[in-house]
Amino acid sequence: MVKDFSSQHPLGDVSPSQYKSEVRNLSFYYGSFLALKNINMMLHEKKVTALIGPSGCGKSTFLRCFNRMHDLYPGNRYMGDIILHPDNVNILSRSVDPIEVRMRISMVFQKPNPFPKSIYENVAYGLRVRGVRRRAILDEKVEDALRGAALWDEVKDRLHQLAYNLSGGQQQRLCIARALATDPEILLFDEPTSALDPIATASIEELIADLKDKVTILIVTHNMQQAARVSDYTAYMYLGEVIEFGVTDTIFIKPKNKQTEDYITGRFG
């Protein structure tokens, strides 16, 4: 029987207020393949943390541990903990409902993936799953989410049109609004601008800068310039391990690890 977050007992010591999440000795297996190796890292409250590294290094695998996406496929397994504060809950525990995890930790994928529904229903979907039925509440939450994604002024007069009618950049902002509608505590971005043009990319980056005042953000990007622009903290990953983690300016200007420096400067990648 799964338990609600509110039923969980505190795990470990109380976290300092600046941390939203702690990753403790996290390893992850795709079947018998070890994809992540003993990762330890903090996510700072209401800051942007970027994951960088070459293709296949484990960035997206790590990101998807946070909202239990790997649970959808048999044979995958976690070892270690991801602690969500202030509850001190290990969200990888089998006693924690993954649906509840995904309500608290939302995700925006690489390519815009609107549902085959209206703009309004795309944003309202998660709210309806949570049991919200009153139209006035739905209307308010949908508007708030669309405003939060800087999309309201562009769609307020066509909320009941199909989301597929929006441009690529608008569709991605709609997906962000859908993620915001349930008031998540952490927002995950997996290469959110890789399928967008430079103008739409700049719009999403500005939005991320605005959102960090409200929510903790973890972003995977292959674009190191983007990581430098949008993030407060950066983790460099290689072969399933976090090689170096720290303040973004330090990682990009004066990294401590030579392997990090080689990747940042283009000598390795």
Swiss-Prot record:
Purpose: Part of the ABC transporter complex PstSACB involved in phosphate import. Responsible for energy coupling to the transport system.
InterPro entries given in the database record: AAA+_ATPase, ABC_transporter-like_ATP-bd, ABC_transporter-like_CS, P-loop_NTPase, PstB-like
Family to which the UniProt record says this protein belongs: Belongs to the ABC transporter superfamily. Phosphate importer (TC 3.A.1.7) family.
Catalytic activity: phosphate(out) + ATP + H2O = ADP + 2 phosphate(in) + H(+)
Domain of life of the source: Bacteria
The keyword Disulfide bond appears for this protein: no
Stretches assigned to the ABC transporter domain: 21-264
EC number: 7.3.2.1
SMART domains assigned: AAA
Name of the protein: Phosphate import ATP-binding protein PstB
Gene Ontology BP terms: phosphate ion transmembrane transport
KW Cell inner membrane (keyword) present: yes
Species of the source: Nitrosospira multiformis (strain ATCC 25196 / NCIMB 11849 / C 71)
Topology within the bilayer: Peripheral membrane protein
Location in the cell: Cell inner membrane
UniProt keyword terms in alphabetical order: ATP-binding, Cell inner membrane, Cell membrane, Membrane, Nucleotide-binding, Phosphate transport, Translocase, Transport
Primary location group: membrane
Subunit field text: The complex is composed of two ATP-binding proteins (PstB), two transmembrane proteins (PstC and PstA) and a solute-binding protein (PstS).
